Structures are given as structure tokens and as C-alpha cells.
Amino acid sequence: MTYAYRLHWVPDNASLVIRLALEEMGVAYEPVLLNRAAGAHKGAAYMRLNPAGLIPALETPDGAIFETAAILLWLADRHGKMAPAPDDPDRGALLKYLFFTSNTLHVA
């Protein structure tokens, strides 16, 4: 089976929320488990997806997306099930907490 999306992930990091969102939205994807211990995320093929070598990365027909918040927002906008639409008055609250969680809480 060919999937529109390929999620490069590891079980113990920010990839989990991406997997949960994809599952909750009912979006088919191919999970690509990375061997972080072997340095798969620093190899040339993965670095073409995410030049920082960080996990996760989502391959889409439009190119690769990285950064957890960016992936979540992109998926929500494409599949319209997990977030207020861009013209919804509640969109600002979503963005505020999405980026606070990604940039402040997750870093800690």
C-alpha cells in the first residue's frame, strides 16, 4: 500500500503527539521507525528531510515538514478535524497554547 504521508518517528519523543493526531483524524500514514542509537536521524537521507536532524519529520506529497507544532498545524489545516479554522476567533488561543507547549514546556 502506498501512503500519502510517511512519519519518521521514535517512541520516546515528540513524535507521539503526531502519531496520536494522525490516528485521531483517521489519516493513513506509513510509520518509519528511526534507529536513533544507530544515528539514523543524522544520516544523509534523513538530513534531507530535516537539516537539523531532529525527530519527527513528516513526508508529504508537497515535501517534508519538521517541527512538531508545524506538523500538527499543517495536518489540522489539511484535514480540518483537530483545530479551529484559520478564520475562527478561537484560532489565536490554539496557536498560543500550541507554540507555548512546543517551545516552552517541551524544551523544559
Model regions: which residues?
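GST-like domain detector, emphasizing the conserved glutathione-binding G-site
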Residues: M1-A108
